[in-house]
Amino acid sequence: YDPDLIMFQDDSFLARPEKEVFEFCEMWSKYKIPFWFNTRIENCKPAYLSALKEAGVYRMTFGVESGNEEYRRKVLKRQASNDRYYEYFNYINESNIPYSLNVILGMPFETRQMVIDTADMVHRARGYDGLTIGMFQPYWGTELRTMAVKAGFLDNAYINSGGYMDKWAIDMPEPYLQEDELDKLLRTFALYAHFGPEMHSVIQESETDDKLYKKLFAQYQQEFFGDV
């Protein structure tokens, strides 16, 4: 075999002992086959990034679970602060290693404002060159599914048979996200993330104004992708 690129199917490639990370980079630098992996933002120590570049890393992908620190700690059990994420985004951007971001909207107990908080975090990340926006799906065996069932947001008999953009499965009372809100935010999230807080009111208006939405989306495409 003579692969041009290798994708490591590991949810958090750098969440392993430091010794293993450096041993991998030393070994891989002998071959320099471009590679791509998923990992967590707060695992990207500057020394890791330098070693990965030397080893021939092609790109990285990160999941941004939520930009709302309280929600992330209480519901998602992620203890890193927003400031820590921003610190590590700076390290990642300074490394010049290309990266993309994955976002999931519509999680249990999530509100519209929490989604906007996530968009604002993505906006501050700055250096990403790709953004995938998915819808929460309550897969069997996950804590978030159990949480949704216990809260009465989901029938325990529900089985997801589609992908991450299948129909939204949970039904939450206000003030949590409603289905029509989620549909609008899935459509406009990239705009909120790209243009930032100063454009929030205009983007919110575009959620119900298709002409304005198309104008903003065309501007976003030009600024983000350039002439393609």
What are these regions (language model features)?
Residues 3:
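Oxyanion-binding "anion nests"
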Residues 18, 22-211:
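A structural motif corresponding to the C-terminal lobe/cap of the Radical SAM core domain
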Residues 206-228:
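C-terminal non-catalytic accessory extensions
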Residues 9-12:
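Glycine-rich Rossmann NAD(P)(H)-binding loop
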